[in-house]
Amino acid sequence: MLTMDDIVREGHPALREVATEVTFPLSDEEKKLGRDMLEFLINSQDEEMAEKYGLRGGVGIAAPQLAVTKRFLAIHVHDEKDRLYSYVLYNPKIRSHSVQQACLSGGEGCLSVDREVPGYVVRSERVTIDAFDENGTPLKLRFKDYPAIVIQHEIDHLNGIMFYDHINKENPSYLPPDVDVFG
């Protein structure tokens, strides 16, 4: 079972590397790590498990956050209609994105960042993702609103990008016109 001790923190070189694609068939270790990542997210959202094991709540995690510089991630997040998006995705790529942008009212956080970073992180409001499941089956998934923000945050990790790289350095509270704000 993964715990917070397994997650590398900002400053670790794996967080700034561009991760390499996995090849199929996946190794048993890659499959297990993907499943463990999803289990971590589920446990972190369970109040009893989170308290017992000292887990910070998370909705997404990428392999580089575990010092594994390979292109896979897990998300476990509900949208505003309580629809669950629970996936382990291998070699995910953003196929297309909306012109309309969105951000979270309270900014973003990260399991690898142990501090609050104020500022808006503006992202696409909708994205279409191409990816593979653990069996190598191709997937085409659409995300909008909060789940779209989460998946973009995690794909950024695969490209060595941290959420705060997107924050306006001169004015963190600057919000471009016509950006939808959630939360």
Curated annotation (Swiss-Prot):
The active site is at E154. Its EC number is 3.5.1.88. Binds 1 Fe(2+) ion. Its cofactor is Fe(2+). Pfam families: Pep_deformylase (PF01327). It catalyses: N-terminal N-formyl-L-methionyl-[peptide] + H2O = N-terminal L-methionyl-[peptide] + formate. It comes from the Bacteria. Fe cation binds at C110, H153, H157. GO terms for molecular function: metal ion binding; peptide deformylase activity. It is an enzyme of class 3 (hydrolase). The keyword Metal-binding applies. One of its GO terms (biological process) is co-translational protein modification. Keywords: Hydrolase, Iron, Metal-binding, Protein biosynthesis. Belongs to the polypeptide deformylase family. Removes the formyl group from the N-terminal Met of newly synthesized proteins. Requires at least a dipeptide for an efficient rate of reaction. N-terminal L-methionine is a prerequisite for activity but the enzyme has broad specificity at other positions. This is Peptide deformylase.
